[in-house]
A protein has these predicted regions:
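Acidic, low-complexity central loop/insert segments
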Residues: 1-34, 132-133
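A short secondary-structure junction signal
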Residues: 10-15, 39-41, 72, 108
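Short, functionally important structural connectors and interaction interfaces within domains
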Residues: 16, 21, 39-43, 47, ...
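Glycine-rich, small/acidic residue-mixed loop/short-helix segments
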Residues: 27, 49-55, 59, 63-65, ...
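Short, conserved active-site entrance elements at the starts or edges of catalytic domains
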Residues: 27-49
């Protein structure tokens, strides 16, 4: 909604509070909304981020169309976006493991009320695990984002 900055807001917005940048980032991370610099950066594709409904395999020619059609048809994504939480501090680019093997990487992180939360790209073979380990043995709880559209479904 665009409003004139000098005009009064209409109800119900007038009685609400403006969201802070931190609150918006918390919402983005908790809901698994991928348009952040750690997720949409040229290193990932829309299917890994759960955006399969936003990809057309029928529409005209576009860069990557053939690759997207192949990935959709063969369930070929190597990793998928997941929400995570952990009581210990972790940062973007931290490597994740499962039973000592490479499992993924944190793409976004935020501390809120003593808990760390964020998004991570998790390798396909590790998606079923509810927990992964951070670089120093931290235990991360992993879950599929609410709005994630599984390219394999």
């Amino acid at each position: 909604v665009w409003c004139d900055p000098d005009a009064a807001l209409p109800e119900p917005w007038a009685s609400g509070e403006a969201a802070t940048a931190t609150a918006l980032e918390q919402w983005r991370l908790q809901s698994g909304f991928p348009p952040g610099p750690g997720e949409l950066n040229g290193e990932t594709n829309p299917l890994e981020l759960g955006l399969v409904a936003q990809v057309s395999t029928e529409k005209g020619c576009y860069l990557g169309q053939e690759t997207m059609a192949k990935l959709i048809g063969q369930a070929g994504v190597k990793q998928q976006l997941r929400c995570w939480s952990c009581p210990s501090p972790l940062a973007a680019a931290a490597k994740l493991t499962l039973d000592g093997e490479r499992a993924g990487v944190i793409t976004s992180a935020l501390e809120r009320d003593g808990t760390w939360l964020g998004l991570a790209l998790v390798r396909r073979q590790c998606l079923a695990s509810p927990t992964l380990e951070g670089p120093n043995g931290e235990q991360l709880q992993i879950r599929q984002p609410e709005a994630f559209q599984d390219p394999d479904a």
